[in-house]
Structure formats: C-alpha cells, structure tokens
C-alpha cells in the first residue's frame, strides 16, 4: 500500500504479567500495554496517567472527523511547551486499533498496527497513575508489564 509501518517486536509480549479487560482503573503501576478497538464512526477519549480529577495524558480518537489527538498539557510536570503540548494526525473513518505502551515517563501509541505512531515523554505527578475512559466506548485489553526490574 506504499506506507511505512512501525511496530514493536513480537518479543515485547513476553513482558506481559497480567491480562484484563480494558476499563477505568483508579491505580496502575504506570507500566502497561493497551490493545484497543474503536468502531468506525465513533468518538472516544481516554486519559492515561490520570489523577483523581481526570487530568493526565489525553488521547482523543475522533473517527467521525478523521483525527487522533494526543494532549500532554495536564500530564504532570510540563517541559518544552514552546514546541506545543498536543499532536494530531489524520485517520480514516474505519474500525481502528490502537496499541499503547506506558512506561512511567514514556508513551508510545501505534494506530492500526503502526500505520500512524506517536512517541513522547511525560513526567506525571506521583498521583497520576490511573486510567479514565472519558467518553465513548473503546474496548480491548489491559496488560500489566513486568520488566524484571524494580520500578519506582
């Protein structure tokens, strides 16, 4: 199809320690993988690294208007704001998958098996360790990851 895809190696699945249905979570260890499914003609917003007020890393999947937006403006300590705190990319209005990795201060988002990719750094506050489904009905799987090392 003339597109360049970027996707993690299959061996990353070896890091999966637990598997549960994707849902709101009050607390995580901030080391996890999400495999999400979004229906065509849908709009969903999730907040990762979320605190009790729902502030964190916002990901808005707007398939109706053909756009995915990542907003880190409420995800902990801010830096490099002169370069902006949001990133967007166009996306087709079709059934869509998103594989998301959170590793404390790093996020990676792979849309449709790597057709579109977001990577970034955030520095969440200590209480920003939840997951919030803010709107829509994304479905999928939550995997807690274990790197075999102690995390803070």
How does the language model describe each region?
Residues 1-152:
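Beta-rich accessory regions
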